[in-house]
C-alpha cells in the first residue's frame, strides 16, 4: 500500500515522524483526509484539532493538537503546532475539566485532548 511521510512538530519538541497510509484532521474550512499523492495545500488547523494517522499494520496514532498549520507537498505532510500530545500522554479527567473552562483556549485544548482519547467526536 502507498504511504505518505508525516512529520508532526510542536513549538517545544518533535512529536512524531514516520510513514502513514492516511491522515485525518480538522482545519478552519472543515475536516480533511490526506492520502498518498494528495495535491499540495496549506491549511490552518482549528484550535481543538485532533490528528489521526493510520499506519499499515500498526495502531492508529491519535494526537491532540492546539492550533497550527498543515502543509501537504510531494514530500509528505508536515504539521506545525503550538502544542501537541499523544493519546497516551493525556489524562482524560483533566481534559474533561479543561473542556468545561470559561477560557476559550483552555476549553478548546480540553476538547482536542478528549477527541484524541476517543471520549468525544
From Swiss-Prot:
The organism's place on the tree of life at top rank: Bacteria
Organism lineage: Bacteria, Bacillati, Actinomycetota, Actinomycetes, Mycobacteriales
Subcellular location: Cell membrane
Subunit structure comment from the entry: F-type ATPases have 2 components, CF(1) - the catalytic core - and CF(0) - the membrane proton channel. CF(1) has five subunits: alpha(3), beta(3), gamma(1), delta(1), epsilon(1). CF(0) has three main subunits: a, b and c.
NCBIfam families: ATP_synt_epsi, PRK13442.1
Annotated protein name in UniProt: ATP synthase epsilon chain
Database matches in Pfam families: ATP-synt_DE_N (PF02823)
Protein's membrane topology: Peripheral membrane protein
Keywords in alphabetical order: ATP synthesis, Cell membrane, CF(1), Hydrogen ion transport, Ion transport, Membrane, Transport
Record keyword Membrane present: yes
Gene Ontology molecular functions: ATP binding; proton-transporting ATP synthase activity, rotational mechanism
Recorded GO CC terms: plasma membrane; proton-transporting ATP synthase complex
Presence of keyword Transferase: no
Family per record: Belongs to the ATPase epsilon chain family.
Organism: Mycobacterium marinum (strain ATCC BAA-535 / M)
Function summary: Produces ATP from ADP in the presence of a proton gradient across the membrane.
Amino acid at each position: 500500500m502507498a504511504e505518505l511521510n508525516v512529520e508532526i512538530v510542536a513549538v517545544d519538541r518533535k512529536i512524531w515522524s514516520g510513514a502513514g497510509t492516511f491522515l485525518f484532521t480538522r482545519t478552519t474550512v472543515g475536516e480533511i483526509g490526506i492520502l498518498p499523492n494528495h495535491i499540495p495545500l496549506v491549511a490552518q488547523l482549528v484550535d481543538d484539532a485532533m490528528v489521526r494517522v493510520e499506519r499499515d499494520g500498526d495502531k492508529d496514532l491519535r494526537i491532540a493538537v492546539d492550533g497550527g498549520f498543515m502543509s501537504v507537498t510531494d514530500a509528505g505532510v508536515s504539521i506545525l503546532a503550538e502544542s501537541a500530545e499523544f493519546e497516551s500522554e493525556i489524562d482524560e479527567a483533566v481534559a474533561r475539566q479543561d473542556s468545561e473552562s470559561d477560557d476559550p483556549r483552555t476549553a478548546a485544548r480540553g476538547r482536542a485532548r478528549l477527541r484524541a482519547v476517543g471520549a468525544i467526536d
